Structure formats: C-alpha cells, structure tokens
C-alpha cells in the first residue's frame, strides 16, 4: 500500500510538472525545458500510468496531460472549435519503434507507402478559405479549440499566407509558422525576450492588439511595429478532409497545396518501404544543421488516405502519422563546476565544466549556460547529473537536470571575474553586464573580434598573441595594431627571451621575428578591405554582418558613418529600434570616439562597391533552389554589382535565379511575370551591368 501511494504521488508530481511546462510552452511562449527533456518526462508518465492505471479513476486518467494536446487557452483571441481535432503526433525514438508503428498499416494494406518530411519547430496554424478568400486562422490551442488569429495572419506576406487562392470550394489547410534562423539572428532577439525562433514566431503571431507583453522596453518597441509580420514564414503539410477535393494520398495533397500557392517543404519524399524511409531519415539528419530553420525530428505519414479510418486515432494523436525524434543528440553527464566569462560587449556568459562524455561523435567536457535565469529555471545543481544537447553548436548546452531539485545550489555572480566591478542587470533582467570600459577582458575580446575572420581577418593575431601584446604593453586597443610597425625595437626587446637577447642583426634568424614580420604584412593588407568588415569589427552591440553590409551602403568611410543620421534607417532593411539605439549609444561614447579618431588616421583603402542608396538599385533578385556555389556568394555578387537581393518573390522582383530542386517561388514568379534565369544568364546580366 505504501508503495502504491508513493507511485501515485510520483505520477501526480509528473502531471503537475508537465501541465506547467505545457502552459509555458503553448501560452507564454517561454519553454522551461528542452523538447528532449519534456519527451523523456512524458514517456516516464505514460509508462507509470499504463502500469498503475488502477490507482486512478477514469476521470482522473482522462484529465492527465498524457491524454491531452496543448494547454488551456488563456489569451484574449476569440476561442473557436476546430472542424476536426488538431492532434499532436506520437513519437518514435528508434527504427524498432518506427517498425512497430508501421506494422498496423502494412497489415491493412500490403502495398502501403510512406511520406517523409522534416518536422518544423514552429507554430501550428489552420487556415480556412471560402470562395477563395481566407476567412479564419486558428492556432492549435488545446487541440479541440484554437485561437482565431486571422487579424494577424492577414498581415503576413502573401507568399507565406495566401489571402486569395484560385479555388472556390471550402478549404482547410494546416501547417507551421516559423522564423528562419538567419532572420532571427539578424533581428538580434537572442535572450532579450525570445529564447529561439519558435518563441519569436509565436510571440508575433499571437500578439493581441490591445495587449502589451511584460517584457523589456526595447522588445516592446520591436513588437509594436506592424512590419514584424513580414518575418513570419510557413510550410503547409495537411489538407483537411482531402476526399472532398478528390485527393487520395499525402503525396498528391502536397502537390495540390503547392499548385494553389501554399509553401510546402521541398525537402520531402514519398518512400516505397521502411528501408527507403530509414535512408531518407538519415539524409535529413545529416543535412539538418545546414537548414535555415529548426527541426525537431522527422514526420513519417502513411501515404494512402484510404486506410486512415481503419488506422484510427487516440484522443491525443492519429495512428496514420508519427514523429521520429533524434535522441542521440542528448547525453547524460555530471555537472562539475560553473564559471562566468565576459564578452566584448561586457555581457556575462555562464559556462559549465562537465564530466567528459561522447556526444554526436565528439568528446565534450564543457557546455554553455546563457545566463543565471537559465540556471535558476532548470534548477541546476553542482555535482549532480544533467542532460546536455548538441544541435549544431560547437559547445553544447545543458538542457536540464536528470533528477528534480527545489532550487539551484549555485549563487549568481555579482562581480566581474576579471576587474571585480559590480555587474549590472539588463532592462529585461535576464542578462548581466560589466560596464567598466577599462576591463582587461572586454578590451581583449574587442581586439579578438576586430581581428576575426569576418572582420579584418588578421590570422596572425590569435587570442594568445593578443594577450601577450597586451601584457607587454605593446597595444592597448584595436587601433594600436596598425602602429606596431613603429615599435619594432620595443617588440624585439619585450618579446625576447631574457637568456637570449634578440638584436636587429640576428633578428632575421629568429622564427619569432619572422612571425612578427608576417603579422605586420597581414596588418598592412587589412587596410584594403570592404568597409562593412571594419564596421563589423568595431563590435557594436546588435550589429552583425548583415547590418554592417547595409550600413556600408549609406556610408563609404568612418567619417560618413559617424555623421550618419541612424534614424533614417528605421523600418528599412530590418533595422529595428534595438539596432538603432545600439548605434547611437556606440557613436555617442567618448572612449569609442577616441578609438574612431585613431582609426581615421590609419589610411584605409576601402574596396566596398555597395550602393550608397538602395533605391538606386539597377535590379532586384531572388533565388530559389540549389546553385553551383553557396547562396551567400551569389548574394555578395548581386549586392556588389549594385543590385538588391530579397529572400521572397514580390512584385518588385525583377529576376528569379533558378537552381536545382527549386521551391514554390517559381510558381509565384510565373504568375507575376517575373523573368526566370539560370546561372549562365545571371552572370551575363552581372557582366553587362558593369558596362553601363
């Protein structure tokens, strides 16, 4: 009896935990744990409930989060019933589990085939059309009722949410709304409010007009802009009631949706058998880090709709589809220590030392923890077991504790670990900063960034050598690098071995001096760079490569940049108030002004060919499909020719550059009368543009 009461208490504890996680995930767009930790906990609950169902009444079992989808709707949007339940998907973590799922379908239809595509980590949305017009847009909600976010869906680009379609029958389609990774990075959302692209997409899509979320002032400014909706993209994958439209398979339904102008994932396949399914899953797994959107597994569907009714469903998921999850990206290890480091902007990052463990083919001994709130939320405890995950990052991230603890046993760091200055919290309260402009670590990291590959690309100035130069008093700022040539004797003296004093006569024989001469040559070459590289190298908070390139269109040198009215960039080129404020703060700072004064004396010969005014662009390009070179290379060629590049096909697009496996952009271009060109025609256009 005592054992039964303990098991019942454990089940109740797991239910409460999952209910809390569901509320934060579905309603607050603020997931408390990683998906893999959530899935493991849910599976533990399901197993305990199966083995101990007799401990609960039928009503209690039906109320368990293991039997429900989503969470209770708490927003101010209209609550609308779904035409058919918007179910979740059951999960498989191995080939054996996938085979077990497919067995029932093969028993019903021996020639069954399957349809496989990536599982997009976004926000589920159901669209309704009457007489070709979009009339309703429902979120998943609790699976039975959803929120009607039509007012916001209408603001999304037509390419991703068609407002009118060439089809007059009543139609319902379901898909996923997301923000791609490069857009998310350029928006500098980071940990200001949204932890990842999914949270950002949900926050924008579910924004209520008269409701301001409780976030920092900068994020509120960002969220209040109507233009935010242009960042949302989509993939559609479900045609509801396909028999009404005489569609017999998932493969045919995808083609049907594509022909109507809906975005469908081009990375998909109809598979003849499970062997084909397993092979395609392996391909997706290998390529997922190169996709520009997050996926949290693969969806495998029975292709033939004719057996869906016989396959049936539970209250939570259909038996006609399953989500295959990549579990080998998670590992269990011991958290040994946590320590703080300071970046070039003064931001504090918490780092974890862990017991070495093999993850995704490499041995891992450290992991990253974004901020102290992250440590608090996960209730991480030193010298206890934790889960770590690797998802494209070089350093993996701790995503949860193996065991439950009431709170963390690690105290927040209050002083800078390098200069001991008191740390200051950001407006959001999530991040901490060292605001001492003379902090040696901030100075070091600024110079490291200045010399990095995407900035001035001075390979001979790696972090260890910069540390040595700072220690010996040879430099104190990034600009000092350009005057090292005037300090050769001092360099010889301060970097020489005390037991073997170097002189000018024997300097040429020294490998160390040869290395220094190589460094000086690299520094000279760094004077002949694209202007955007120097802008990026300045290390202005929130200004990445994309923003730096755009700024170089409005200013051709430092003097012009310093006198630029940054408010002119508002609502242009994805420049929101956060970036504008960062630019103004940077150029109003006295220490930064001294650095810029120094850099203006260096004698740069900028190679940039970007237009100073985007409106003077001679042509506008979009790209679809796989080309012979990386896409970034074509974007560079387009911009340097004086043309403009856009991710989407719009009425203002002049040319669509077409590669292999092109997506739905080709149909959009044809309908809009946009000229479609291949690579040979593209380079001819670029060549001819230089003659005019």
Swiss-Prot record:
NAD(+) binds at residues 35-39, 88-89, 117, 140, 176, 301, 325. It is an enzyme of class 6 (ligase). The keyword Magnesium applies. Residues 611-692 form the BRCT domain. It catalyses: NAD(+) + (deoxyribonucleotide)n-3'-hydroxyl + 5'-phospho-(deoxyribonucleotide)m = (deoxyribonucleotide)n+m + AMP + beta-nicotinamide D-nucleotide. GO terms for molecular function: DNA ligase (NAD+) activity; metal ion binding. The active site is at 119 (n6-amp-lysine intermediate). Keywords: DNA damage, DNA repair, DNA replication, Ligase, Magnesium, Manganese, Metal-binding, NAD, Zinc. GO terms for biological process: DNA repair; DNA replication. Its cofactor is Mg(2+); Mn(2+). Zn(2+) binds at residues 416, 419, 434, 439. Its EC number is 6.5.1.2. It comes from the Bacteria. Belongs to the NAD-dependent DNA ligase family. LigA subfamily. This is DNA ligase. It comes from Mesomycoplasma hyopneumoniae (strain 7448) (Mycoplasma hyopneumoniae). The gene is ligA.
């Amino acid at each position: 009896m005592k054992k039964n009461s303990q098991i019942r208490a454990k089940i109740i504890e797991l239910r409460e935990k999952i209910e809390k996680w569901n509320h934060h995930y579905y309603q607050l767009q603020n997931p408390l744990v990683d998906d893999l930790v959530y899935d493991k906990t849910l599976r533990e609950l399901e197993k305990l409930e199966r083995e101990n169902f007799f401990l609960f009444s039928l009503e209690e079992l039906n109320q368990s989060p293991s039997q429900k989808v989503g969470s209770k709707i708490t927003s101010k949007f209209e609550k609308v019933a779904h035409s058919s339940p918007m179910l979740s998907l059951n999960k498989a973590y191995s080939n054996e589990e996938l085979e077990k799922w497919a067995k029932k379908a093969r028993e019903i239809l021996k020639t069954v085939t399957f349809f496989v595509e990536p599982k997009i980590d976004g926000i589920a949305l159901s669209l309704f059309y009457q007489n070709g017009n979009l009339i309703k847009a429902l979120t998943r909600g609790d699976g039975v009722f959803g929120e009607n976010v039509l007012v916001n869906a209408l603001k999304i680009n037509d390419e991703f949410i068609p407002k009118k379609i060439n089809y007059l029958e009543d139609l319902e389609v379901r898909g996923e709304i997301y923000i791609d990774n490069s857009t998310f990075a350029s928006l500098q959302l980071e940990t200001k409010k949204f932890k990842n692209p999914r949270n950002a997409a949900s926050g924008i899509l579910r924004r209520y007009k008269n409701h301001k979320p409780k976030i920092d002032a900068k994020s509120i400014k960002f969220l209040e802009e109507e233009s935010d909706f242009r960042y949302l993209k989509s993939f559609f994958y479900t045609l509801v009631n396909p028999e009404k439209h005489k569609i017999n398979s998932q493969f045919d339904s995808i083609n049907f949706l594509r022909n109507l102008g809906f975005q469908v994932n081009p990375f998909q396949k109809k598979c003849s058998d499970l062997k084909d399914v397993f092979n395609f899953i392996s391909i997706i797994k290998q390529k997922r880090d190169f996709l520009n959107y997050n996926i949290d597994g693969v969806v495998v569907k029975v292709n033939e709709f004719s057996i869906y009714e016989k396959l049936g469903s539970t209250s939570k998921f259909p038996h006609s589809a399953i989500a295959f999850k990549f579990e080998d990206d998670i590992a269990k290890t011991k958290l040994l220590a946590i320590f703080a480091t300071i970046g070039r902007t003064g931001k504090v990052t918490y780092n974890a030392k862990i017991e070495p463990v093999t993850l995704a083919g490499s041995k891992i001994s450290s992991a990253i923890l974004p901020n102290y709130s992250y440590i608090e939320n996960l209730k991480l405890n030193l010298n206890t077991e934790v889960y770590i995950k690797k998802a494209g990052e070089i350093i993996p991230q701790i995503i949860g504790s193996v065991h439950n603890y009431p709170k963390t046993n690690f105290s927040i760091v209050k002083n800078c670990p390098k200069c001991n200055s008191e740390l200051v919290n950001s407006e959001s309260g999530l991040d901490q900063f060292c605001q001492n402009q003379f902090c040696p670590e901030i100075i070091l990291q600024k110079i490291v960034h200045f010399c990095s590959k995407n900035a001035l690309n001075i390979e001979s100035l790696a972090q260890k050598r910069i540390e040595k130069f700072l220690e010996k008093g040879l430099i104190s700022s990034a600009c000092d690098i350009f005057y090292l040539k005037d300090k050769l004797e001092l360099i010889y003296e301060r970097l020489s071995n005390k037991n073997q004093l170097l002189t000018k006569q024997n300097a040429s024989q020294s490998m160390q001096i040869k290395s220094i001469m190589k460094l000086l040559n690299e520094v000279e070459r760094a004077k002949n760079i694209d202007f955007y590289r120097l802008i990026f190298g300045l290390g202005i908070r929130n200004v990445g490569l994309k923003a730096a390139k755009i700024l170089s269109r409005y200013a051709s040198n430092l003097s012009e940049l310093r006198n630029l009215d940054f408010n002119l960039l508002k609502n242009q080129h994805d420049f929101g108030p956060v970036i504008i404020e960062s630019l103004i703060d940077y150029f109003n700072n006295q220490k930064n002004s001294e650095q810029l004064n120094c850099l203006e004396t260096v004698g740069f010969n900028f190679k940039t060919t970007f237009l100073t005014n985007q409106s003077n662009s001679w042509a506008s390009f979009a790209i679809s499909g796989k080309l012979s070179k990386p896409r970034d290379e074509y974007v560079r060629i387009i911009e340097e020719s004086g043309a403009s590049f856009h991710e989407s096909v719009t009425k203002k697009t002049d040319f669509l550059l077409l590669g292999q496996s092109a997506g739905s952009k080709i149909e959009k271009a044809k309908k809009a009368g946009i000229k479609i060109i291949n690579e040979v025609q593209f380079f001819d256009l670029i060549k001819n543009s230089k003659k005019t």
